[in-house]
Amino acid sequence: VRSVLNKNSIWHNTQRNLRRQNFSDKSVYKVMKQLYQYTHKHFVTFPVAYWSQTPQGDSLLVSGRVYLPKYRILNGIIVANHYTMTADEEVPSNRLSMEMVYLLKGYAVIMPDYVGYGLSRDEIHPYLHWRSAAQTAVDLLNCMPELLDYYGYSYPKDVVVTGYSQGGAVA
């Protein structure tokens, strides 16, 4: 586990978030070890880059994260829109997320970072502009047929859109 905890990895950021929640070093190590072993056995996850738009309608390269169960039959896709985040290290492309629990039921999970985070961190995050945040989710979902085909998955018939806090407004 320690070999993958480089400064900018999702593992490092997940570990840092556990420490911020007052987990002891021993507990953090135990959780990270189990999480690492589980993830490599049951699912794959990777950051993605794709085109979306700024609130003004200009094209912009943005990022997000995709989680796929290792078996090739999907029950559906969950578009999980995240809550308000204040630091780039917290966004989906830079850490593991609790929304990956949907993998246990055979769902792919996709999570956009939103404009102003991840690859678009140089842009101002338009916090109350729900339409631009929703556009990043729609554009990520529109990438899924090609991405799933590339990795050998069939496109499922069900798509569920969910979110919490800011993500609830986006959904």
Question: For the regions a protein language model found, what residue spans apply to each?
Answer:
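Glycine-rich "HGGG/HGxG" loop immediately N-terminal to the catalytic nucleophile
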Residues: 116-126
